[in-house]
Curated annotation (Swiss-Prot):
PANTHER family: OROTATE PHOSPHORIBOSYLTRANSFERASE 1-RELATED (PTHR46683:SF1). It catalyses: orotidine 5'-phosphate + diphosphate = orotate + 5-phospho-alpha-D-ribose 1-diphosphate. Its EC number is 2.4.2.10. Orotate binds at residues 34-35, 127, 155. Pathway: Pyrimidine metabolism; UMP biosynthesis via de novo pathway; UMP from orotate: step 1/2. 5-phospho-alpha-D-ribose 1-diphosphate binds at residues 26, 72-73, 98-99, 102, 123-131. InterPro entries: OPRT, Or_phspho_trans_dom, PRibTrfase_dom, PRTase-like. Its cofactor is Mg(2+). This is Orotate phosphoribosyltransferase. HAMAP family: PyrE (MF_01208).
Length: 213
C-alpha cells in the first residue's frame, strides 16, 4: 500500500504547487521550499486534490457531520471534497461563507447547507490562523460545533512564539488539525528520492532553525 502523503507531495511537485529553491516567506524567512495551493487550478488537479483531502479526513478519525469552507479558497475545497467523500460512502452537506453579506436571494454571509452538528473546517494551510478563528466564530454563532480543521500542508514551523500556527489552533480551541502532509513527510520525500538530494540539507537546516516537534 502506498503512502498517500508521499503521493500527495509528488503530485504537488508535478503540478508546480510545491517547489524547491530559495524563497522568502511572508514572515521574511528564507525558505528552501514553497507551497502554493492556488496552482491546483484546473479540473483534473482539483479532483485529485479532493481525493487526497477525503482520504486524509477519513484516516484522521475526526467525527464530523458537515464541511465548511472559508472564503475564498475553502469554497471549492469544501464542494470538491464533499463529492469525493460521497464517493467513499460518506455523504455530508457543506457550506461556505461570503466575504460580503448579501441582502437579497439567500442573503447573509452563509451559503449552502445550514451549519448544524459537528462542522469540519477545510482550508489550504494555516498561516496566521485568522481564517480558522473567523470560521469558528461563524460556526458557533449558528449554534453548531467546530469539529476540527483539514488542511493540505502543515509547515510545522514556529510563528511569533514557540508554537506553530497549527499548534496554536490546537491549543487555543482544543481542535484537531488534519493535514494531508507535513514538513516531516516532505523530509522523508527528500531522503528517499536522490534527485532532490541537493535540497535535503537546506530543509534540514530550516527545520532545525524554525521547526517545531
Amino acid at each position: 500500500m502506498t503512502d498517500f502523503r508521499q503521493d500527495f507531495l509528488k503530485f504537488s511537485l508535478a503540478q508546480n504547487v510545491l517547489k524547491f529553491g530559495e524563497f522568502t516567506t511572508k514572515a521574511g524567512r528564507r525558505s528552501p521550499y514553497f507551497f502554493n495551493a492556488g496552482l491546483f487550478n484546473d479540473g483534473a488537479s482539483t479532483l485529485q486534490l479532493a481525493k487526497f483531502y477525503a482520504q486524509s479526513i477519513i484516516e484522521s478519525g475526526i467525527r464530523f457531520d458537515m464541511l465548511f469552507g472559508p472564503a475564498y479558497k475553502g469554497i471549492i475545497l469544501a464542494a470538491a471534497t464533499a463529492m469525493m467523500l460521497a464517493e467513499k460512502g460518506v455523504n455530508v452537506p457543506f457550506a461556505y461563507n461570503r466575504k460580503e453579506a448579501k441582502d437579497r436571494g439567500e442573503g447573509g454571509v452563509l451559503v449552502g447547507a445550514p451549519l448544524k452538528g459537528r462542522v469540519l473546517i477545510i482550508d489550504d494551510v494555516i498561516s496566521a490562523g485568522t481564517s480558522v478563528r473567523e470560521s469558528i466564530k461563524l460556526i458557533e454563532a449558528e449554534g453548531a460545533t467546530p469539529a476540527g480543521v483539514a488542511i493540505a500542508l502543515d509547515r510545522m514551523e514556529k510563528g511569533t512564539g514557540e508554537l506553530s500556527a497549527v499548534q496554536e489552533v490546537e491549543k487555543q480551541y482544543g481542535l484537531p488539525v488534519a493535514p494531508i502532509a507535513s514538513l516531516n513527510d516532505l523530509f522523508i520525500l527528500l531522503q528517499n528520492n536522490p534527485e532532490f538530494g541537493q535540497f535535503l540539507e537546506p530543509v534540514r537546516t530550516y527545520r532545525r532553525q524554525y521547526g517545531v516537534e
